[in-house]
Swiss-Prot record:
This protein's record includes keyword Transferase: yes
Gene name of the encoded protein: purH
UniProt lineage: Bacteria, Pseudomonadati, Pseudomonadota, Gammaproteobacteria, Enterobacterales
The organism of origin for this protein: Erwinia tasmaniensis (strain DSM 17950 / CFBP 7177 / CIP 109463 / NCPPB 4357 / Et1/99)
One GO BP annotation of this record: 'de novo' IMP biosynthetic process
EC number of this enzyme: 2.1.2.3, 3.5.4.10
Protein's name in the database: Bifunctional purine biosynthesis protein PurH
Gene Ontology molecular function: IMP cyclohydrolase activity; phosphoribosylaminoimidazolecarboxamide formyltransferase activity
Notes on the domains: The IMP cyclohydrolase activity resides in the N-terminal region.
UniProt catalytic activity: (6R)-10-formyltetrahydrofolate + 5-amino-1-(5-phospho-beta-D-ribosyl)imidazole-4-carboxamide = 5-formamido-1-(5-phospho-D-ribosyl)imidazole-4-carboxamide + (6S)-5,6,7,8-tetrahydrofolate; IMP + H2O = 5-formamido-1-(5-phospho-D-ribosyl)imidazole-4-carboxamide
Stretches assigned to the MGS-like domain: 1-148
Similarity remark: Belongs to the PurH family.
Annotated GO CC locations: cytosol
């Protein structure tokens, strides 16, 4: 089998035109004949490149508003023809070999993500000719190179220069893998979208209804292999979505430190998603996926100092997230005070990075600033299945709160209640959070009994000498009994925020009134398992 195949003719037809002009220029300069279609052909011609329209090459015009462009034997014969085996039949029918196909597909995902997308819009953004060419070229990778990612353009030109304008079989095989991954992901998106449209077309059916598709097809790209998973006997890797428009641990850039571990990534995600809830400069410290200290301040150094006070013991070896740039003063405070696994922030100043560089094992990530949190899906694997739900982006506004106690909360109590309510959303259930002056003073996480979470929060505050009297308390779900309120009153809590909805709400409210506690119902639960 010939390892190298020369590239003499290339067909270029792309929706995402980033880098295509420079790539086409590089190919043309190396003597490669260019075929192209539609907007891509116009772009190349306008730049003065010698390019042949596919319709001129086939002798058959584009038609049906561009629906039929490349579906022609001269195109697919040129791609699928096996060199040395199909040469005679290709010559007989005037089919020239096509050595490289450069294609990316109609922007279906971007189209259906628009709020105003109609079914007709979605249908017109289903690419037919593109995937057909991609699959044809990938199938015949022994002879043809298929390029679906602009990130490969530079490396391909470098290899052409190193190998007298030819590509190795290994490269063509790698490109074919990417091509099949590309079309599989594309078809999955279309199947998911159409599967979600079943109720609109059929009304009552025996199929499971709702907005989720009947068959869920997921496509993630491997970002890195890991030394091990949650435990050392488990193998692991990190996969990310191809199109992530929101600042996240998946899109973050690591600017310092050793490779992220499985647990690092999980904990960093928890910290970053929590700190996104706050508008003021904020710091979240996480250990084992639970916040152990959260605070806001006039600047992030103040936020860090206050968050650290909540639980210095648990902060050791933790993850620290900020919603502002990591500055020199904050970096110095962290490095001089504690062992930290990961620091993540929208950005980091050069001065801050000089400080963290003194501890080379500290992982520093920058994720960019976020504007708005995007809707999406959360997944939980169970044995033999997958639970799917919307991301929990719910958060109550002041107007949605309902005071159910006799006593109204003060302005300070209300601010603290809303603060700890945001934190409770990110604490494992059963979750109890004590807060005062926009700073957590005690967090009780993951207990099977809600009252024990309340007791743990009180113990945490007492251990650090933090004053509880006059503080607010948040509970991620309703209190099934009054004992949680009694426990809160015993340590000086004066305001409680919770969803409400228990059959014993009257007893719980009565307990609050007995203790002179202001109680607020949100009407929204935030279980986290």
């Amino acid at each position: 089998m010939q390892q190298h195949r020369p590239v003499r003719r290339a067909l270029l037809s792309v929706s995402d035109k980033a880098g295509i002009l420079e790539f086409a220029q590089a190919l043309s300069q190396r003597g490669v004949e260019l075929l192209s279609t539609g907007g891509t052909a116009r772009l190349l011609a306008d730049a003065g490149l010698p390019v042949t329209e596919v319709s001129d090459y086939t002798g058959f015009p584009e038609m049906m508003d561009g629906r039929v462009k490349t579906l022609h034997p001269k195109v697919h014969g040129g791609i699928l023809g096996r060199r040395g085996q199909d040469d005679a039949i290709m010559t007989e029918h005037g089919i020239s070999p096509i050595d490289m196909v450069v294609v990316n597909l109609y922007p279906f995902a971007q189209t259906v993500s628009r709020a105003d997308c109609s079914l007709e819009d979605a249908v017109e953004n289903i690419d037919i000719g593109g995937p057909t060419m991609v699959r044809s070229a990938a199938k015949n990778h022994k002879d043809v190179a298929i390029v679906v990612k602009s990130s490969d353009y530079q490396a391909i030109i470098a290899e052409l220069d190193a190998n007298e304008c030819s590509l190795t079989l290994a490269t063509r095989f790698d490109l074919a893998i990417k091509a099949f991954e590309h079309t599989a992901a594309y078809d999955s998106m279309i199947a998911n979208y159409f599967g979600s449209m079943v109720p609109a077309y059929h009304g009552e059916t025996t199929e499971p209804a709702g907005r989720f598709p009947r068959t869920l097809n997921l496509n993630f790209i491997k970002k890195q292999d890991m030394r091990y998973g949650e435990n050392s006997h488990q193998q692991a890797a990190f996969y990310i979505e191809e199109h992530v428009g929101e600042a996240s641990v998946a899109t973050a850039q690591q600017v310092q430190g050793k490779a992220l571990s499985y647990n690092n990534i999980a904990d960093t995600d928890a910290a970053l998603e929590c700190v996104k809830e706050f508008d003021q400069p904020a710091c979240v410290i996480v250990k084992h996926a639970n916040p152990c200290g959260v605070a806001t301040g006039s600047a992030i150094i103040e936020a860090y100092e206050r968050a650290y006070q909540t639980d210095p013991t648990s902060a050791f070896g933790g993850i620290i997230a900020f919603n502002r740039e990591l500055d020199e003063a904050t970096a110095r405070a962290i490095i001089s005070r504690q062992f930290v696994e990961v620091i993540i922030a929208p950005s980091a100043s050069d001065a801050a990075l000089k400080i963290t560089a003194a501890k080379q094992n500290v992982r520093v990530l920058t994720c960019g600033q976020w504007q708005q949190r995007q809707t999406g899906l959360d997944f939980k694997r169970v044995n033999g299945g997958l639970l799917v739900q919307d991301r929990d982006l719910g958060m109550v506004s002041d107007s949605q709160l309902r005071v159910v106690s006799k006593r109204q909360p003060s302005e300070q109590e209300l601010r603290d209640a809303l603060f700890c309510w945001k934190v409770a959303k990110f604490v494992k259930s059963n979750a109890i959070v004590y807060a005062r002056d926009n700073m957590t003073i005690g967090i009780g996480a993951g207990q099977m009994s809600r009252v024990y979470s309340a007791k743990i929060a009180a113990i945490k505050a007492a251990d650090e000498g933090l004053e509880v009297t006059g503080s607010s308390m948040a509970s991620d779900a309703f209190f099934p009994f009054r004992d949680g309120i009694d426990a809160a009153a015993a340590v000086g809590i004066t305001c409680v925020i919770q969803p409400g909805g228990s059959i014993r709400d009257d007893e719980v409210i009565a307990a609050a009134d007995e203790h002179g506690i202001a109680m607020i119902f949100t009407g929204m639960r935030h279980f986290r398992h």
